From Swiss-Prot:
Active site: 121
InterPro entries referenced in this protein's UniProt entry, alphabetically: Cytidine_deaminase-like (IPR016193), FdhD (IPR003786)
A single cellular component GO annotation: cytoplasm
GO biological process entries: Mo-molybdopterin cofactor biosynthetic process
Name this polypeptide is given: Sulfur carrier protein FdhD
Keywords linked to the UniProt accession: Cytoplasm, Molybdenum cofactor biosynthesis
Recorded name of the encoding gene: fdhD
Amino acid sequence: MNNILSEEVLNVTDFTTSRQLTLWKREDLQSSQLDDVAEEVPVALVYNGISHVVMMASPKDLTHFAMGFSLSEGIIDSPREIYGMDVVPSCNGLEVQIDLSSRRFMGLKARRRALAGRTGCGVCGVEQLNDIGKPVQPLPFSQTFNLGNLDRALKHLNDFQPTSKLTGCTHAAAWVMPSGELAGGHEDVGRHVALDKLLGRRAMEGEEWRQGAALVSSRASYEMVQKSAMCGVEILFAVSAATTLAVEVAERCNLTLVGFCKPGRATIYTHPQRLIAD
């Protein structure tokens, strides 16, 4: 398998679509004009020929999404357990066909569940309340971050949201280096998918992305915390608030959770010992 999209797939993965819409302004009469609308398509993750999950997502960076989802959902422990990926068109959307190691595939089949794909829904299809939440090993305390460098990251987060600038419809997730520089980022109509894309990219980048923190443009739900912890991320910054369950999970797994990140301020919910305040 390879990671190169065919021409046919590239033709359907434009990130926006122009549509004729009706615009209303208080001072004007209604008028019709073209405007940009964010693309949202069903994306099936198919492991060794068996469809495991269908999620609604932006049709871009799908191999990163597949890698991040596989890691954050505990399907694999290492990128080496995926031997290859292909993105191919299907009748109603796209498929990421994943060549998974035999050992991991057996484990996946043993706990396979059907997820009904809704935009960025992290618990869709969970059959019982007891299935919510995965056991996460407590994180080490090997990272620190100077909060004085957070403003730099926030200033450039929009650089990784070109579709949001056109449509106002996407979330972003970016990797913040200790200096505050953004090493890279991804956007998607679903906040969980954007984070999975980032986590997959981080795993594939290797040692260069070991140090630092994740920054998301959305709120921090418990799924965002859990996905980060499953991938070894020790610090999660969110532009918006955190939920009570997110705080509980972060406390339990030793993740430093920070919300309401704005220039010159932030709310630290858990494990502030990783943060340096200059």
